Amino acid sequence: MPINPLYLFPNLFTASSIFLGMMSIFYASSYQFVMACWLVVASLILDGLDGRVARLTNTTSKFGIEFDSLADVVAFGVAPSLITYFYVGYNFGRIGMAVSALFVIFGAIRLARFNISTNTSDPYSFIGIPIPAAAVLVVLCVLLDNKYHFLEENTEKLFLGFIVLLGVLMVSNIRYPNFKKVKWNLKLFILVLIFLSLVFVRPLETLSVFMGLYLIYGIIRWLFLMVKIIFNKNKSA
């Protein structure tokens, strides 16, 4: 059966994401962490394009969904995990190995759960922080340390703890916004333009603030919901 060439187009973006993920791993193993980290960010851009291209060309397929998940494991699971290990994890021996490995495992679980719940969950939110967001948070920490040098012996332990936290958040039931499903309007368009302008001027700092707020938003929202549930239970008791 002949294959429609259009089906290859979105998968080319996915394959490119895997390629960048592998390049990131190679650079990390050579201790070229800045390049390794920015390659993960570049993979995020490609990851956001493949699904949109598939929908625009009407070439969505089960193969594309599974291929995208495998790409995410490489680019947003293995790559940031090894960046973590080569950057600070090796200083902690087996603990560093375990933390790096757990990040990949939790990320794979997150992707598997996403694939089986896509048609049943709220399309405007994710259950658990998405693995691309977790990966970008990891590499942004490394990039910030390369620029501002805040990781020392004690703070390196906190960094590993942060990696564990991201892993737990990926498999948690805490909801995070799904920006792929936002409804565009003039106000949002202006906000995006402002954001892109800030990224152009100060890319690292702007992305770090944005992703930090994204991370905290989910946790604070969850805490408010827990307090509300407890309050309602006490009120009805």
Region locations from a protein language model:
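Topogenic membrane-insertion module of multi-pass membrane proteins
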Residues: 1-48, 187, 199, 221, ...
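Interhelical loop and helix-boundary elements at the membrane-water interface
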Residues: 1-18, 53-73, 112-133, 173-186, ...
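Multi-pass membrane catalytic core of lipid/isoprenoid biosynthesis enzymes
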Residues: 8-15, 56-111, 141-143
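Alpha-helical transmembrane segments
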Residues: 9-16, 36, 70, 74, ...
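Alpha-helical transmembrane segments of polytopic integral membrane proteins
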Residues: 22-25, 42, 46, 80, ...
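Helix-coil boundary and interhelical linker segments in multi-pass alpha-helical membrane proteins
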Residues: 23-38, 74, 78-99, 140-158, ...
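Hydrophobic, membrane-facing alpha-helical anchors
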Residues: 48-55, 104-116, 155-173
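C-terminal membrane-associated helical module and adjoining short loops/tails
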Residues: 123-237
